[in-house]
From Swiss-Prot:
Keywords: Cytoplasm, Nucleus, Ribosome biogenesis. The lineage of its organism: Eukaryota, Fungi, Dikarya, Ascomycota, Saccharomycotina. Pfam families: Ribosomal_L24e. It comes from the Eukaryota. This is Ribosome biogenesis protein RLP24. Its main location: cytoplasm. InterPro entries: L24e/L24_sf, Ribosomal_eL24, Ribosomal_eL24-rel_N, Ribosomal_eL24_CS, TRASH_dom. It is found in: Cytoplasm; Nucleus. Involved in the biogenesis of the 60S ribosomal subunit. Ensures the docking of YALI0_B00990g/NOG1 to pre-60S particles. Activates and recruits ATPase AFG2 to cytoplasmic pre-60S ribosomal particles. Associated with nucleolar and cytoplasmic pre-60S particles. At the end of biogenesis it dissociates from cytoplasmic pre-60S particles and is likely to be exchanged for its ribosomal homolog, RPL24. It comes from Yarrowia lipolytica (strain CLIB 122 / E 150) (Yeast).
Amino acid sequence: MRVYNCHFCSSPVYPGKGIMFVRNDSKEFRFCRSKCHKNFKMKRNPRKLRWTKAFRKAAGKEMVVDSTLAFSARRDVPVRYNRDLVEKTLEAMEKVEEIRLKRERAFYKNRMRGNKAAQLEEDRKLVEAHPELLREREVELRRMQEAGEDDDDEDMSEMEVSEEEESEEEREKVEIALKSKSKRKMRA
């Protein structure tokens, strides 16, 4: 029993799951779900459907050329069982997986590097097109500050009375609460 890859979307097909289609020339096609099978029967190109791995690779969203990807290739050569070999293989598999994940993260960061500048540019255009949005936000912030100052004055007077009766541990809790309130005000 082995885990196959879907012929259409390249996701894993576990034993007992999915659909297997055998063509007249005895070529096997395995599909993870009926969605992939139906798209295959409709002769759709997986590279044009955004949800497939083929699209992601063709569009440059996933790594295509990397030495770690070669380790997942199928090998049909039978090897005599050797405990040491199995142990080393399992260790190597873990290391290869770690390396692959690091490289994928680096690839993703590299791909997303220019997005922040593009997003800022979009935001600038939005503000230029609709300056009234900023004015509305300023009014909301002023209202929140005014409402927040009134509530804080009442809270402070209540806390001063209760602090005289509390022990040192409870005083620390109150101070932490006050700090968090002031941080919230600063954020708003």
